[in-house]
Amino acid sequence: RIDEVSGILNGTTNYILSKMTSDGYGFEEVLKRAQDKGYAERDPQADVEGYDACRKIAILSSLAFGNYIDYKDIYTDEELSILLKKPNTEGITDITATDIKYAKAAGAVIKLLAIGRRTDQGAYALVCPVMIDASNSLYSVNSVFNAVSVHGNMIGDAMFYGKGAGKRPTASAVVADVVEAAKNPGTTVMGDGWNAKKLELMPLDDIPGRF
């Protein structure tokens, strides 16, 4: 069975963090460059606030764990998310050049990670900036590239890697989905063993972590 799905699921935010790390630019300056290159939308909120990655990890975790996971349940602890009716993820808008310098001094980089994991105590999912060092396979995933790491109890770790932002990668993904839907009308991606019952996630305070 699959116990964990995690990774860098948004090419826009990864491009921004990569440029802040390699070139020392501030968030706003790199965001403008990303928009000029077509990597970021004119309204980038869905990307930079983590909403896009949140929806993606909800889908991937649902498929991996065999139960429906509501993206609105992922890492919710602020009243603002309730008022806006949006998932309360931690995006990258508050990441500063100083944060990047501290990460470098610790031999790490900052990545916006989406994580879905199930344990003996229950399942949880979250999207937030994380400091990772070179021992992590996602450390060297830079620019507009995405990577998804899957951990299975039999296969161990496997990683899938590719471009996640830009006109051609986006168009390719959309067209592939349309073609798949047209070739297989009336079917879904949910296979045997799927349970539409909503999977309740562990509260934030029970999620293990370290600083």
Task: Show the residue positions of the predicted features.
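Short acidic, glycine/serine/threonine-rich loops at helix termini
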Residues: 17-21, 162, 172
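Glycine-rich phosphate/pyrophosphate-binding beta-alpha loops
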Residues: 156-158, 162-168
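A conserved regulatory-domain signal marking ACT and ACT-like small-molecule sensing domains
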Residues: 173, 178-211
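Structured core elements
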Residues: 4, 16, 111-112, 126, ...
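Substrate-binding/catalytic subdomain of NAD(P)-dependent oxidoreductase enzymes
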Residues: 20, 30-140, 145
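Active-site lining segments that contact anionic ligands and/or coordinate catalytic metals
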Residues: 122-124, 145-147, 155, 208-211
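A contiguous active-site-proximal alpha/beta segment in oxidoreductase catalytic domains
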Residues: 1-18
